[in-house]
Amino acid sequence: MTRTFDIDYVLANISDQDKIALLSGIDFWHTHPIPQFNVPSVRVTDGPNGIRGTKFFAGVPAACLPCGTALGATWDRDLLRRAGELLGDECIAKGAHCWLGPTVNMQRSPLGGRGFESFSEDPYLAGVAAASMIVGCESKGIIATVKHFVGNDQEHERRAVDVIVTPRALREIYLRPFQIVARDARPGALMTSYNKVNGKHVVEDPKMYDLIRKDWGWDPLVMSDWYGTYTTIDSTNAGLDLEMPGVSRYRGKYIESAMQARLIKSSTLDARARKVLEFVQRASRTKVSEVEKGRNHPEDRALMRTLCSNSIVLLKNEENILPLPKNVKKIALIGSHIKTPAISGGGSAALKPYYASTLYDAVREALPNAEVLYETGAHAHNMLPVIDRLLSNAVIHFYNEPMTQPNRKCLGTEPVTTTAFQFMDYKLAGLNRALFWSTLIGDFTPDQSGIWDFGLSVFGTANLYINDELIIDNTTKQTKGTSFFGKGTREEIGSMKLTAGQTYKIRIEFGSANTTTMKTTGMVNFGGGAANLGASLRLDAEEMINRAVKAAEDADYAIICTGLNQDWESEGFDRPHMDLPPVGIDKMISGVLDIAAHKTVIVNQSGTPVTMPWASRAKSIVHSWYGGNETGHGIADILFGDVNPSGKLSLSWPIDVRHNPAYLNYASVGGRVLYGEDIYVGYRFYEKTGREVLFPFGHGLSYTTFAVSPEALVSPGTFTPENPSNATVKIKNIGGAAGAQVLQLYVAAPNSPTPRPQKELQGFEKVFLRPGEEKTVIIRLDKYATSFWDEIEGMWKSEAGVYEVLIGTSSEDIVARGQFEVNQTRYWSGL
């Protein structure tokens, strides 16, 4: 039943201790209740591409949507609104009142560990995409939490790094998506970032709170990122409403003490408590499930399949290799991702999916009569693949004593289906969460004979035994790695010769986080601990490549599907380079292209760009991001023409990592990172410097052809902030297939005395057309279409002059032009 309470009455009658309790979570995912005043606890939940629920370990399966950059690549407001609605429904099923998403940080560099979570390098596209999803989610009565405000654009030293950025770049690039969200969606919550901006942690910077609440007139609940509160007095006085997670580290008795010293006023406490009560009241109006459960409805699966296929970008299609015919007699499926799809990046985005469709199965469905030749070709993992399908009868036992303690008492047992686990939010009656031990035991039955490599990484301590023989010691001596939000060890490797079909008893003896012998700073300690055990048959790399080349040569067509996965793109660390995994993938692709380029399709899976040294020799390249539950089906729908590709790159694709605008100023150096590229992020930089890219921002091909009228009619011809202009063009499908085109409107200020980008995205429309169909399309501008941030005046400025309207099918392919005039220079603040 939905609870009701009167906020004014509650504030007037509860104690200061109750008010203080409201200002932090009660645990990892819940706010603090006040039962005597009918104030309930409400649940928040990750993540950016799905609703995990309250459990990292033994969680309830969930819908996994495509990653943020994939969703941005749809350029489809309505489809993204429907995606938000699905996330709202998933929250209700998981008993959650608040979704901790979406993410709208900027991809300054292709190396950002969480770059895949955000929508685009362009602030306008990112803001519009985020607003669309928020509107959909909140239409279900679920509060959305836009994050991370602001400048959390890298993982390296993210809690300590000081982002040095000009006021202009801060406003035009990094704050702009949040501003669009505030104007168009007004979500109920905002999450602060871990980092500093220009000398002060955002979470305790009064200027940042004044910006959203006074300048923008938007007053959401503001919560910290998890363990992202660093002070009591400064953060409370600045405007932070809710410290997460609980139990509080900086509030509670510390606020009491600060109030006694009159360092925090009673009125400030009331303001913070009121905002939390408003949040709880709004959230608790929606009836959510009392127990966490899944949905997995047919209509949800259909929507996720559409999201996946509509995000996929056809980068190259020489000789019209695609779509592939369905009467193929023999097809080669090559690559690490054929049978193990990359459905999401790592960290907060990771969850237990309802299912994950594979490209192997999807191709078999599309070509039921074809002979399929499958080869791995080259591995793409950075850590050995987790053991799942070869694991049986696996459980984890929990103890308050180590394995050396005789007759220790088992406090509980959980069944498991994989050899990866995180205990950060795990609860068990009697278990000492500060210090505990567990034992995973299970049966491992290899499907091939030979030497098997096992890899074990841990946050805590762990040893691997096979048939009671110690194979890996990750307890005695530990070396820091990047796993588990940067708190884990590197992967320690052991090996054993195994026989196919024979069952081996595997055992992991695990000690919780506080047993670790490593000392790490600057990383979030989520507690509980975690471990990951992977395994792989040791194979000869050259033989794998040779087998892949032979399969491609023998087949009518070959599909290579490879790329990155959450080993390479994840919260907690940044990518070390822009290359594909350095285990022979490029060599394998080149070998196949040497003999079968004319009949080979290359499908890349990654959330951000990768180098493609073989791109000029490939005839057909498809980029499919991280596609969620329906990854395999979505890719197959494109490859066989069931869906006409309409995705457009949400990121520029540089040829080389050294070409990207943040190359010289990315990682934290001396505790700070200089945003030296200023406003020239992404295509703004490449165009300003004349730097060639492999594929431009907004690029994406189709199986049909569109004709656009070369003249864009702009009306009114005189642009004012109160009455912005619109551009009208005609577009016709002159090809033989139904399809969609994205008309991208860029505005240029060629005669401005102020340094400006060559052009900037200021509007777009996605248009669906049947063969022969023609439509008139209106693309609407807003008052910011001509403006920039004037650092001297501290206001937005629209300069008088003539502006060009450039309508393209990518940032490089301009197909229609127009112009308008601003006859008077104007300034303004706010939204």
From Swiss-Prot:
UniProt keyword list: Carbohydrate metabolism, Cellulose degradation, Glycoprotein, Glycosidase, Hydrolase, Polysaccharide degradation, Secreted
EC number: 3.2.1.21
Glycosylation sites: N13, N474, N514, N604, N629, N726, N823
Gene Ontology molecular function, alphabetical: beta-glucosidase activity
Catalytic activity entry: Hydrolysis of terminal, non-reducing beta-D-glucosyl residues with release of beta-D-glucose
Pathway where this protein functions: Glycan metabolism; cellulose degradation
GO CC terms of this entry: extracellular region
A GO BP entry: glucan catabolic process
UniProt entry tagged with the keyword Secreted: yes
Ranges where the PA14 domain occurs: 389-549
Subcellular location: Secreted
Keyword Glycoprotein annotated: yes
Active-site feature positions: D225
Broad class of enzyme this protein falls into: hydrolase
Family listed: Belongs to the glycosyl hydrolase 3 family.
Protein function: Beta-glucosidases are one of a number of cellulolytic enzymes involved in the degradation of cellulosic biomass. Catalyzes the last step releasing glucose from the inhibitory cellobiose.
Protein name: Probable beta-glucosidase H
UniProt lineage: Eukaryota, Fungi, Dikarya, Ascomycota, Pezizomycotina
Annotated gene: bglH
